[in-house]
Amino acid sequence: MAHNDKPESANEAQDHSQPLDDGGFFSLNDVIMAGRHQITRSEHLLAADTRRNVRNLLASAKLLALVVIVSLAMGVAAWAFLASLNTATNYREHHAWIYALLPVVGMATAWVYKNHGLAAKRGNNLVIDSALGTRLIHMRMAVLTFVCSTLTHLTGGSAGREGAAVQIGGTIASNISSLAHLKKHDHHDLMLAGISSAFGAVFGSPLAGAFFGMEMCFIGKIDYTAGIYCLVASFTGYFTSLALGTEYEANVIASVPNMTPRTVAIVVISAIIFGLTARLFAWSVRTVKSLYGRFITNYLARALVGALVVLAAYAMLDAWKYAGLATWLSGAGFAGNTTLADAAIKLVVTALTLGAGFQGGEVTPLFGIGAALGGWIGCLVGIDPSFLAALGMLGVFCAGLNVPITTCMMAIDLFHGTAAGFFVIVAFISYLVGGHRGVYPAQRIVSPKRRSLIVDEGGTVAEAIERHNDLIE
């Protein structure tokens, strides 16, 4: 009997099935189909990821374009604002009779803000709240702070310029955000960029301006998510204002002492003094405002009395030269030609001006107070006054606004990193000494400065002050 060695069928010859763990079989076709399915799924994921990246890139490009628009507008506004302040200052210095109009300007400012200012009277605190929310800032805020700040300086009020500039930058950013229908996170980034462009353009310090936008709204936090936008905004605003002819004040540190134990001890003690000075400044403005509100119910009467008190202080202290920006004070501090009285008088007249409701800013007066105080300390301890005047500028500014990283960047902008180690010491010690106080009550306390202040975490500076007052009572 013959045997047939061939397979019973062709299908059996082609059977490549493999056993599965559960006893079943899978074929080559199953493998091919599964592979195709996996490739298709990967292609879909890649396509979705590509579309998402393109959308994000387009959104970032759109936001960056808006940042440039805001910064260009702010650069022009800063140039116009600084030019108006220079004109007002020159006129006042040559026409002393203009001081007589300070009460008129005070009452006019109070009336306009009361009846037509909407929420503009909240100033930079409104800018902070808008940056952390979505609230639109009406365009009239920029107009009002521009005009009223200029009139304050024209008639002799002692104030600065940063506050008005940040309000202008915040207003421009808020309105462009509204026109572009930005989402909350993009609105937030654009607002911080507007703040950065204002600071960089007004003070000629683009590095500090970039970090100021990221740091201003918070205590204990830097918002790096807006970092690139703040950097672009600050430099764009600065270069725009510079190109239009803005000139910035410059002070030079003549010599830097060696980092010896004695020098470090002097710097640490000075930093503590600077921090306490900033606390005194913020307390003075707040107290003057509170006293006027408590004892004078009519807002026009408050403005009138406030202006008359400022004029009386000028007359009694022979302090007419401290009116306006008084930028000469910083130069005198660097030259070692200031006394403790210079810092004290500037602090008093500025607190009386801002507490009475006049428009302006706080930073330039803080610079002058710090430089005058530092220069005096330098002469007292036998260290180059320009060195301690620079530390005083930075320390009082840092403690007053709660911005230590911005302060370090400003040291690079203004003094090219000279004495960097000393700058860092002053920035962080004055920041700690300043506590949860400052010129911006709306600042959010994200990370308390000390463990003992943990109860303030998550609240605002205003709430921390109120809590402290309740404990005292």
Where are these regions (language model features)?
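Alpha-helical transmembrane segments and immediately membrane-proximal extracytoplasmic
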Residues: 2-473
